């Protein structure tokens, strides 16, 4: 999972604290796997991917899960002074968007030159809305969510009030899916801060999972498409305002419930199941969730997936067998590419603004 803070927080308690760290790293790996799974469905089969129930299920909650975990790990950053905070977050989240965005355009243009197609890397394209509002949108969304929460914690007003104010403000920001992402980020923060709230979530975990499953039954193609065209629906008056509001609320709630469901599932089984050598080795990938998100997007989604197709395979064998296998291959290959990048300090500094 893309933990935008990229910080692992150890809790007190000996072996138990290690297991808690392990299960949240594994949760990040799980979410990374989901986003790759969704991209494989989207790009490697010639069909209407929105009609695919597996795709719609993944996309109902996986980005909310990313953001919830980011909020969970954000508390140490919230204690920083203003200038170091914004410098750190810009370096961590905005710089890679620029560095990898330019790299992707140059890589794409190298291929376009060979294929005699129009070049993508031009000053107008670099500064276009398409680039800034789409490429690596989640990193930019995470930066905005961090900034909103940070500014809220710096106010002199009571906690419940700044929470309400920032939630309201988030609904007015039209880019980077902030209206849906910030509530998940904030909930992750609150769950980490409040033991009583976390206890409530644990107590009602079965109810949360059941509600998510019920909502999935009504998460149709029409609902998915409508929830992703809210701005157009409002501008073109294609739907009554009340219906638009309910559709927006539905998307928000199903995302929160889905993220919470897997959050509490990993929380519940972590202590007893995840404390094995195999899971510990797998959890290492969770420490590179930001890099996995970026590198798999550039290398596979932007480049290799354009030359691969499994359309010759039947629909359900593709979805139930091919997609999970290909997704795992992409996940582990991406991790190896990241490992290679970090072997070259200059390259890692250039692409990620850090070294390990």
Language model features with spans:
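Alpha-helical transmembrane segments and their immediate juxtamembrane cytosolic regions
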Residues: 2-356
């Amino acid at each position: 999972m893309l933990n935008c803070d990229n910080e692992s927080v150890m809790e007190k308690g000996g072996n138990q604290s290690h297991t808690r760290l392990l299960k949240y790293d594994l949760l990040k790996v799980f979410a990374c796997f989901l986003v790759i799974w969704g991209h494989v469905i989207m790009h490697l089969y010639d069909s209407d991917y929105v009609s695919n129930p597996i795709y719609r299920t993944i996309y109902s909650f996986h980005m909310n899960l990313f953001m919830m975990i980011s909020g969970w790990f954000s508390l140490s950053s919230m204690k920083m002074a203003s200038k170091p905070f914004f410098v750190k977050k810009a370096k961590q989240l905005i710089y890679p968007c620029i560095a990898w965005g330019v790299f992707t355009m140059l890589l794409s243009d190298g291929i376009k030159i060979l294929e005699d197609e129009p070049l993508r890397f031009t000053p107008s394209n670099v500064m276009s809305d398409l680039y800034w509002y789409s490429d690596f949108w989640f990193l930019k969304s995470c930066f905005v969510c961090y900034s909103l929460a940070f500014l809220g914690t710096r106010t002199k007003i009571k906690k419940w009030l700044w929470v309400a104010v920032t939630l309201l403000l988030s609904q007015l920001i039209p880019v980077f899916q902030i209206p849906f992402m910030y509530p998940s980020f904030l909930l992750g923060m609150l769950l980490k801060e409040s033991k009583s709230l976390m206890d409530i979530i644990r107590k009602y975990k079965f109810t949360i999972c059941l509600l998510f499953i019920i909502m999935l039954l009504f998460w149709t193609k029409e609902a998915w498409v409508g929830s992703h065209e809210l701005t157009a629906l409002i501008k073109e008056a294609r739907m009554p305002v009340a219906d638009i509001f309910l559709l927006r609320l539905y998307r928000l709630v199903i995302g929160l419930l889905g993220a919470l469901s897997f959050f509490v599932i990993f929380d519940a089984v972590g202590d007893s199941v995840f404390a094995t050598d195999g899971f510990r080795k797998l959890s290492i990938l969770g420490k590179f969730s930001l890099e996995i998100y970026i590198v798999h997007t550039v290398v596979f989604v932007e480049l290799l997936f354009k030359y691969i197709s499994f359309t010759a395979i039947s629909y359900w064998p593709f979805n139930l067998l091919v997609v999970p296998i290909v997704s795992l291959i992409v996940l582990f290959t991406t991790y190896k590419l990241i490992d290679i990048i970090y072997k070259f300090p200059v390259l890692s500094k250039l692409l990620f603004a850090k070294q390990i």
